[in-house]
Amino acid sequence: MPQRASIQQTADFLGVSTKTVRRYIADGRLKAVRLGPRLIRVERDSVEALMRPIGK
């Protein structure tokens, strides 16, 4: 996964829908940056943190 991935790439990586990724961004569970009016990129570090088991 690239350092900054598209919403579709992130959804494919996590095995969820793009709607779920957008909800994670809105809830603050994933960090994302807007690079233009329609271009959103998700930070790889936040995806890895989301996948990290609790207590590890």
Curated annotation (Swiss-Prot):
UniProt cross-references to InterPro entries, sorted A to Z: DNA-bd_dom_put_sf, HTH_17, SinI_DNA-bd
Cross-referenced Pfam families: HTH_17 (PF12728)
Coiled-coil spans in chain: none
UniProt keyword annotations, A-Z: DNA recombination, DNA-binding, Viral genome excision
Gene Ontology terms describing biological process: DNA recombination; provirus excision
A GO MF label: DNA binding
Task of the protein: Excisionase and integrase are necessary for the excision of prophage from the host genome by site-specific recombination at the att site.
Family: Belongs to the L5likevirus excisionase protein family.
Name recorded for this polypeptide: Excisionase
Source organism of the structure: Mycobacterium phage D29 (Mycobacteriophage D29)
